[in-house]
């Protein structure tokens, strides 16, 4: 409702303005026509007085009437010129105000368009800046945990990553597997061949995991021929077995305690280097 009423007011004002403009133009054209007719009237009056002055006997009365008519004609011409100039000035003043308002509207529209263009340009540059991905770290990052002088680059990613994964796999093994490894490290299976000497090298069995498990040299060794019959392992004497078990358990505990300290650090380094190389 408010929009319809405002539109009706604007239309009414525009119609009134058009009506006033038409009235002013008609009045101005009428005054110009009166001036043109005044010229014709003056010429016809001059011809009439010329003919009457030559024919009439009372020339003094003709001269006086001519003077009166000329004075009235001059007054009428001045009046017409004044009215025309007044109307022309009013027309110019009204149009000048209208022109000034239109100029202000145009300037405001230009300013709005300029602001919109600036905003669009800034938003576009902001979006382009968001698209860029700037590096957050250097190519070589120094870790103060293992010493200030050491650094970790992207060249040795694979080696350290594999070692870290192996250490995590060993750490996450169940206790039963660890106990089996510990107990199995002290039993040996003899290598028996029918036609081949004992000098042939043994081959380690392949691990089912992706990364092979770290094994000590004292684990069980299997023969390369799967068809050979298995024999019971040779039993060591009791004192020798107790000494070897105690020594091996101490060595394994020392290795595990030393390896656990650097497992998490190596894993963290490997992951950081891989993320840097991808960036």
From Swiss-Prot:
Keywords: Cytoplasm, Cytoskeleton. Its main location: cytoplasm. The keyword Cytoplasm applies. Disulfide bonds: none annotated. One of its GO terms (cellular component) is cytoskeleton. It is found in: Cytoplasm, Cytoskeleton. Residues 194-208 have a biased composition (Polar residues). Residues 219-228 have a biased composition (Low complexity). Residues 192-211, 219-241 are annotated as: Disordered. The keyword Cytoplasm applies. Involved in regulation of actin and microtubule organization. Part of a WAVE complex that activates the Arp2/3 complex. Binds SCAR. Belongs to the ABI family. This is Protein ABIL4. It comes from Arabidopsis thaliana. The lineage of its organism: Eukaryota, Viridiplantae, Streptophyta, Embryophyta, Tracheophyta. The gene is ABIL4.
